[in-house]
């Protein structure tokens, strides 16, 4: 049978190393999966092994520490020099090899936040690299020490089973990137910015040192930006030239975004915003294999990128988190069954910023993969299960329960599935969330779940149906503030698809994620919008990365303004009144008002379904208004408990 993804699944050879297909996994900061151990624990090993099991050709892990050891501002570093750390790192490589993938390790180098601390100063490529911190220029003696340290690391990595390593020089923020950028490299010696050869000299010397220590067959992945921001002196044309300058030193070139905040593309950008840069480098005649990264998960898009010759290889980080079986589904020709990443960045932020439990919005197993053998035991008997509510929590619960063999009926009082996610159909910047909603609906259509649309479930109906268990996922309703004139406001969910019914001038009450997204949707439809937020900052409920990106996109619109520290006191025909931080009464004139003050759990509706005839589980917003990740995780947990 002809493969649907023949090019993506074709083997690829670099030197004497053969990759089974073109799909790599990108390194991520996963240390929130464990405690402060300086070695990978069972949670980390299981996580990476699952990617190999799911079909990845290369699993690139994060990461070993740089020389010299610095204060632990870097959450990514294992200690490669401790014997017991080496044992666990060897187990990690072995687990990856067990499923047929190559094991690669990202070797961490200094960043602006975690550099080389020597004699009380932050040692960097050039003086003044880090604003607000005392810095010293790296001496040639220290550069030699760094090369020696890299050799020591790769010798150990090769000995304990790793096939390759990765060096990071993207975004001009790391050690190697600092040499590349004119903004950070102010040296006056042969490593200075006078030519591209000079700026790459130290990198190439390090690559040569690695190959000298570990051999040519120990491959080097090199991550770089296809271009850097204005002022850095590095364009896509420079990147094409650079590819030729490193091709005899490194083995694979990752082509990434210009900045750290662009590296994690979200729904504000096209799905694969970096492919054009990889294509440019390929077309330049560079001989080094080119890997593209950024936003990949659609198997058809990936197949086209390889088949058209725009790139040789593709790497994904979040794609493998959302669906660790992505590669398996490629081999089975089931691209439509790949779980879409919604690009919310809760994975990155939970691990790298918040330092709490590692999570994924669409993969409820994330963070507990190593526990699933004891958590997800086969049911002792198959039961008749009702799920009430067709939002993300209800659909996840129904699918999970059905996959366990139970007989499942899903009741949804409206004529369509999707619940609170249906708004995403109308907002271009939420297209990833819309894909996830459509994915759940499609999976239900293929499943044995009986879906009853337009049916409001009642306690009497459930008792009469002889259900053994009921999962209640009836969601939440928009919270309406108890203020004069509140009846004049439109709830935020109503706005989507009905934007033309609102006046040109709109005030949105509430500056959380829902309110700010609604405001952005309205300005993109031609409205003039002011967001009124009681707290001193907007978007306090959003993940840090999404908050930064949404704030940035809001800032592009002159007709979108925000007022913070203002407590709404009423709505009149003239507009919205509020009390400012000084206690003065103010008026925001407008023709329409949108209420985005939060959601109220439909707890009474949930409680009305309780009966001793069956066991009840409440999940999602009807238990506590939260986000999609928490709703889906709770739904999954309830379903595997039956």
Where are these regions (language model features)?
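Glycine-/small-residue-rich beta->alpha transition segments that form the dinucleotide
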Residues: 467-469, 473-479, 590-602
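Residue-level detector of alpha-helix initiation sites
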Residues: 296, 391-393, 416, 476, ...
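Glycine-rich dinucleotide-binding loop and its adjacent helix/turn
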Residues: 364-378, 442-443, 453, 460, ...
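Internal hydrophobic alpha-helix adjacent to the cofactor/substrate pocket in enzyme cavities
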Residues: 323, 327-329, 520, 524-525, ...
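Rossmann-like dinucleotide-binding cores of NAD(P)H-dependent redox enzymes
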Residues: 407-446, 521-566
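Flavin-dependent oxidoreductase catalytic cores
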Residues: 1-388, 392, 396-403, 407-408, ...
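A conserved FAD-binding loop/helix module that cradles the flavin
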Residues: 542, 548, 619-642
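A conserved short coil-to-beta-strand element within the FAD-binding core of flavoproteins
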Residues: 453-465, 564-575
